[in-house]
Amino acid sequence: MKKRVLSLLLCFVLAAGLLSVCAPPAQAGTIADAFELFIKQPGQIKKLFNREVAHGDCGPAGDEASVHYKIYEVTNPTVVQDNPFLQQIWQIHDYREDAQYYGVYIFGDGKMADYAATGQKAPWMGNVEVTEYNDKGQVLGTTVVENLGEEYLALAYIADGTDEEWDGRTERYSGVTNVGAYAFKDCRYLTCMFLNDDITTISERAFYKDEYLSAINMPRKLELIDKYAFYGCDTLTFVRARNCSRLRRIEDHAFYSCTMLAELRLPEGLTYIGPWAFAWDRILGQEDTTLGLPSSLQTISTGAFAFVNHHKNLNIPANVTSIGDYAFMCDYYMNNLTFSPGDKKLTIGKAAFFGDNHMKSVDLSNRVAQIDRCAFAGCEMLEEAYFGDKIDTIEGRAFTSLDNAMKIAVEGVLNGILRPDDTEQNADQAGDISTALNMIAKVTKLKRAVFKNDPAKSICAAADSNRSFPDDCVVYYPQGSYTWLAELKDDGTWQGYKTGFWHGDHIAAFTDTVVAPTCTEQGYTLSLIHI
């Protein structure tokens, strides 16, 4: 029901063009300093571990005893005065002062187990037998806590090299190197998680739908964030991975629908962002309006940043060769889109920037070779676009509006990804959002398409219902382009579009009906414009 309400709210907001209503939580800025202290002093978590109530093994199959866990009673931070960060976090949520919460401490040598098999759960999940104590700390016996991980696990700590007591003796352990698949899935009250710096993998669905997960550090040796790892972590506010120099891949849906994620720091070395990885992180970028994509990045996959509303400035790095379908769809407040120069050709996918409503000009002259169908459809403020010598194909409706086929395609995609584990509500939600998209899928105000060199080899003509540009758009081409001159009509049109001459860096001549562009874009600026 919660997601349903959010979906409907978004639809009305989209229709009104008022996505600013999705403001960040008031606490986002106020807990930033405390979060830094938490990362620097992970012992804050261990201080809240009280009496041990259960323990066991959680190593991989065949080597279970290589990694161990201990479950502790947790001193409720709402009544502890020396832990301001956890007090702030816990006050946001509806923790009960009369409830007993728990923490899990994991230590050992190497990998912990994965729990992806059907019916398999981590030992701290489900019904757990724990030691029961009286008020004097004396053991009374045991009792079963139903759904301990799902309802009462509040803190977790995965240790690096450490000396720990096990089976009556102290042993040295080298450290745990991963977070197992599904290990903390659906831990609703898991608030703070510390990962040691030797962890290389955060596995599939490791923290899936941990609604209250507010603080987690990114290990320095991290190499992979697997699919759905942080899906639906609604109160996750910071992802600071800039020091994770070994991180290469963030897989599909990894941070999907982290609706309060306000700050994202990605490291140099990252090459791949998977499908829908950060989609629906609706306030991402409001704390810092520039999305800093690392220069090492090569692939931005389908829907990677769809419905992220606050990136005012976006630069596509020089090594990126593919921007997937819907990649930045409905990034409503995007003002400036730039492309770093380089030698690698770049393809922009279907509806990749659809509905990015605050761009007035876009310079695609650096590396852009193919612009797919509806790539910039619905960009209602867009007035001019510039193209370079790499451009080969501009597909139908690239700069106009969605057609019915594309609307159906978008709805079909949303139907498949909105709620992967709850298909019953998908169709309704997808339909609601599709209706909202129709409200902003209007023909753009684009008046100038300026080609720095020879125009695209493939383009949809103005008379075509799937025209690449609005039919009143003026297409400027280089003077002396024999290909164009041969195809130019007697009335001065090309493919049905009005035309003007372009000298490669300034306008040389215009027809009487053409208004001169401002010539202010990079690579086109000259002090003299001849009319």
Where are these regions (language model features)?
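Structural signature of tandem-repeat unit edges
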Residues: 104-109, 127-178, 188-201, 211-224, ...
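Disulfide-bonded cysteine-rich modules in secreted/extracellular proteins
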Residues: 52-60, 503-524
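Conserved small/polar residues in nucleotide/adenosyl-binding loops
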Residues: 530-531
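Positively charged n-region of N-terminal signal peptides that target proteins for export
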Residues: 1-5
